[in-house]
Structures are given as structure tokens and as C-alpha cells.
Amino acid sequence: MTTADYRFCPRCARPLTERADPEHEGGRVRQVCPDDVCGYVHWNNPLPVVAAIVELDGKILLARNAAWPEGMFALITGFLENGETPEAGIAREVFEETALTAEQVTLVGVYEFIRKNELIIAYHVRASGTVALSPELLEYRLVDPPLLRPWRAGTGYALADWMRARGLDFEFVDRPGQ
């Protein structure tokens, strides 16, 4: 969420103002409640997102979200639940979205996705089972790892790092699924 998304204080409903206070916020402009008793500051911190490079029978599962254009396939992603570790969160997301069971979950890396104000925690997930997509996904592909083509945004960098660690050559594409 960007600061433009907030117009009113979520605590007391007063209109928010902007403040740049080098002592408290390092000089960054923040939206704040003008009521000193309330004291709300909208920090606009990045949202943690988990992503999975799902490996099933030696192939990587890429899926198309129902909201995406035809031909656009990417990694399984999702948000953490309160009190959930990232490892448990990605195992849950993989199961919820594909019905696959995470057998092994290994950290690939942590990546910025500034455009969406997200911090992506990416994992390689070795999975088992039979794919059954959730309603939010329309279709999937199982791709041989050497044929993967990472994209220059968000989870694409995680896929590139995973491929690089396995000695796989690749070229970046503009968007997922190309």
C-alpha cells in the first residue's frame, strides 16, 4: 500500500498530514495523524510475500492467475498469516493453490519488489501429489528447468538465482511466461 492510499487516520479518523522529521523518521516524508494524543504514523513498510519455485517430478510448476492475461505464467506466491513462519506460509500457499504437499522447503533468497512495496521471500519447494488448482489459478505448466526463462522483476530474480545455482544458462524475458 502506498501513502496515497491513506487519507484518514485508521485510529481516530482525522485527516492525515505529511511530516518529514529527521530526528524520528530519517528525513523521510511520512503520513501522520496531527493529533499528538493519537500519534499514528503510517510507516509504509514493505509487505512480506512468500514465493515458491515448485519442483514436481523434476519439473518446475508455473501457474497463471485468473486475473492475468493469457500466456502469463509465474511462481506460486502468497501472503503470510499472523504467527506463521515464511517456511510454513509457503508450504500452506503451495497446498492451497495447487493441492501439492511441500516435502522440502529451501530458501533461495530475499528480493525487493519496490513497485508493489513488497519484500519477496523465495523458496525452492520440492513437492509431491497431484495438481488441483484453486479457483484463483486458471492453468499451469510443468517446465523442464533448462527451458525456464526468468523475468526482470519480483520473483523472476529468484528464479534466475535458482537456475544460476544449478549451472543452468538463461536469458531474461520482459514478463513471466514469454
Language model features: what each stretch is:
Residues 133-164:
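NUDIX/MutT-family hydrolases
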